[in-house]
């Protein structure tokens, strides 16, 4: 069993008409290298308490992220894929928000790591908007 979510960020000055309200528009150039370093830290089994919604009713905040891939096309669209057996409420959007902070230089990798290990929602970046989130695949 596994689910694949993808999140779309348009990383350029303007959004293409077809992508309006279907991507998160981020004008500031994001560092793909920094975001990939963060994705590597999120991969594996962790306590994702810092990344869950305050209204999340899951019994355990421990989840295993099997894979995170980040790709950017020529038009500036960044696609981030997350693969796991299950996710917490708002977990993917919260992880994307933190990866964005890392990519734009608001956080360094040690701050990113501290947030993951803190288990405190208050230290997490704001969750990314829902408009860029897609459930791509479910395997039974």
Indicate residue ranges for each PLM-predicted region.
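Structured-RNA-binding interfaces characteristic of tRNA pseudouridine synthases
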Residues: 1-140
